[in-house]
Amino acid sequence: MENTTRRLPAPNARRCAFTGYRPCKMPFGYDEDSPLGRDFRKRLRETIEVLILQGYRHMISGGAQGMDIIAAETVMDLQKRYPDVTLEVAIPFEDQAKKWPEEYRARWQRCIDAADMLTVISHEYTKNCLYARNRYLV
C-alpha cells in the first residue's frame, strides 16, 4: 500500500484532523445505532459542518476504529453537499485493520477507497508508528 493522492486540497486550505476514542471507550461501545450512538453521530456531523462553514476544507482521519472512522464516514457523506472538501486518511501502518472485526475492516476499506488522499506512515507495524501518525495529524 502506497501513499495515494486522487485529489489535492486547495492551496492553503484550512485543515482539521480527527482522532479519538476507540469503540470500547465510547459511551455507546460498538452500538452506533443506540440512542447515544445516533446522538453522537448527529452532533459530530453538526460540528464538522460548522467547521466547513468556517472555511475548513481538508479533513484528516487517523483511520482507527471508533471516532476516526466515524468522522471519516461523516466527511464522506458531507462531501455530497460540499464537493470542495477533501478527505485524507492517515494510517499508522499498512495492515492496521488486519485483526479488526470484519464490519470495521470493511468500513476502514471504504474510507481508504473513498479518500482523496491516503498517507501511510509505515509499511509495517513499529513501536513508534502510532505516535508518528499522531504527530502527522497535528
Indicate residue ranges for each PLM-predicted region:
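Acidic/glycine-enriched connector segments
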Residues: 2-138
